[in-house]
Amino acid sequence: MAERSSEFVFTGNPARVIFGAGRMRNVREEVERLGRGRVLLLGSENLREVCDQVQDLLGELFVNRYDGAAMHTPVEVTDIALAQLRTSEADCVVAIGGGSTTGLAKALAARTGVDQVILPTTYAGSEVTPVLGETVEGRKTTRSTLAVLPETVIYDVELSKNLPVPIAVASAVNALAHAVEAMYSPDANPVVDTWALEAAQALARGLRGLVSDPSCRRIRTDLLRGSWLAGMCLGSVGMAVHHKLCHTLGGAFGLPHAPTHTVVLPYAMSFNASEVPDVMDSLASAMNVSNAPAGVWDLIADAGGPTSLASLGLLQTDLDRAADLATEAPYRNPRQITRSGIRDLLQSAWEGNRPPE
């Protein structure tokens, strides 16, 4: 990797992380450590059994539960949960799930200042970031504020070990995207570089392992640890074209969050590769591939993940509007953002062919 400037700024995000198999058992202790005693439990319909277990662990600290977390954090869902929070006089939320449930917890914190304890069941990574994305009338917007950074995150590999392989693949590549874009962020620094490369290595190793032994605890631990490190990257530096496109496609066209990240990442990397060859070389080395964009596409394809926007249901006739939305406002990126360049990127991602080396 080419030498970076010796000048940089690094700000650590203040959060407590508990990592290990079976650590879900600490949830009550962590709520009490925050000095809280009335918990609104957040989950989703597909995690009812796990939510029941956590509810039992909380005992009398539990006061109410909302199982309606939705993708892309629509404000109308937040309003329903907010009413429950206030009616219950809850002073803490415990969120179980992936990015949707974490997003709901953050949205509640943004509105009330309520404390958050997060138990991730996927590899989203948003649980260790001060970033909140919300969807209002079909448009997804993001903001960054420490007011939404969860106080405590409990990483229990038992909660993600049975994550179905297709969901695990998409979620892991979502995490990988955080590490990749952190490497070429204008805010990049040696601390984040170290996290990003370690995350890329662990996630690539985990993606390969999912194919051969999806139930292996070591593989699932690699993925969970990689997602945590990648999330730390996301929470520390600004992101670029990949994240902008994914937010546009999710908010405006309703595409699923993690699969969209999975499809777009190799093409966003290819789009920027000529401007940051040092970054791509370092990532390729960490992931043990010869070419970073093509190597990521191979990892996804070999693991059975989606490789085209067409497969996610996006119509070719949607690409022009997507390009317009993604270039409405300027944002930082290694390669200059133009409407034609983004339209070409989207076309490549829609077709789904392997990026050239």
From Swiss-Prot:
<keyword id="KW-0560">Oxidoreductase</keyword>
<keyword id="KW-0520">NAD</keyword>
<dbReference type="Pfam" id="PF00465">
    <property type="entry name" value="Fe-ADH"/>
</dbReference>
<dbReference type="InterPro" id="IPR001670">
    <property type="entry name" value="ADH_Fe/GldA"/>
</dbReference>
<dbReference type="InterPro" id="IPR056798">
    <property type="entry name" value="ADH_Fe_C"/>
</dbReference>
<dbReference type="GO" id="GO:0046872">
    <property type="term" value="F:metal ion binding"/>
</dbReference>
<dbReference type="InterPro" id="IPR034786">
    <property type="entry name" value="MAR"/>
</dbReference>
<dbReference type="GO" id="GO:0004022">
    <property type="term" value="F:alcohol dehydrogenase (NAD+) activity"/>
</dbReference>
<keyword id="KW-0058">Aromatic hydrocarbons catabolism</keyword>
<dbReference type="GO" id="GO:0009056">
    <property type="term" value="P:catabolic process"/>
</dbReference>
<dbReference type="GO" id="GO:0018506">
    <property type="term" value="F:maleylacetate reductase activity"/>
</dbReference>
<comment type="pathway">
    <text>Aromatic compound metabolism; 3-chlorocatechol degradation.</text>
</comment>
<dbReference type="Pfam" id="PF25137">
    <property type="entry name" value="ADH_Fe_C"/>
</dbReference>
<dbReference type="InterPro" id="IPR039697">
    <property type="entry name" value="Alcohol_dehydrogenase_Fe"/>
</dbReference>
<protein>
    <recommendedName>
        <fullName>Maleylacetate reductase 1</fullName>
        <ecNumber>1.3.1.32</ecNumber>
    </recommendedName>
</protein>
<comment type="similarity">
    <text>Belongs to the iron-containing alcohol dehydrogenase family.</text>
</comment>
<comment type="function">
    <text>Plays a major role in the degradation of chloroaromatic compounds by channeling maleylacetate and some of its substituted derivatives into the 3-oxoadipate pathway. This enzyme converts maleylacetate and 2-chloromaleylacetate with similar efficiencies.</text>
</comment>
